[in-house]
Amino acid sequence: MPILCLHTAHSNAVIFEQAAAELGWPAHSIVHQVHEELLLEAEAAGGMDVALRRKTAGQLDALADPADIEAVLLTCSTLGPAVADCLSDKVWRADGMLARKVAAALQRDPQSRIALLCAAPTTYEATRDLFVQALLSGDAHLRLQLQCVEGAWALFRRGDLSGYQARMTDAAFQAYAAGAAQVVLTQVSMDGVARYWQARDSHPVPWTVAASALQALGEMRK
């Protein structure tokens, strides 16, 4: 049965298709729906409000209702909190699966530091709350550093994807230089940073939402 992804940008559908292909998923494993208006509403309101949360949750539940849909994956970090309001147990946050990966890494290596990068100001609070809640130990959040990269989202919104990728890549290198053991790209739109990563000083490839979410779903299928 297919996975249905709800996106707020057409480019995110391409990213998930690329990630699925790299993981060896069969063609047509993912069905995509794009609702740009939901993110535009959130940005106009300065973030998620109660009405938009309810609206988004209702759409997600409706998408999950058909029996032939295995799971619904919300790929927009800004809208992520709406998943908590869903009635269906088939709805997942893509960035939530990445957050659990980070929590597991911190549990394995209690001394490591992880840098979280976001770009859209409207996603900062939702991302912070998500990753802190995913941690298993009380003080693990002290080893997380969340940065909203200044100016990056404006580049994305202008359609300057090469400039956006360059800005996020520079931020990732700076995070490693500051002592991070792992950089985590918390928005799907940043996938290109990892895809074209040129390692410096053996720094690991940053973790991405799409690959982490699909890997987690693949494990759940076993």
Regions found by a protein language model. Name each.
Residues 1-222:
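Non-catalytic structural scaffold of enzyme domains
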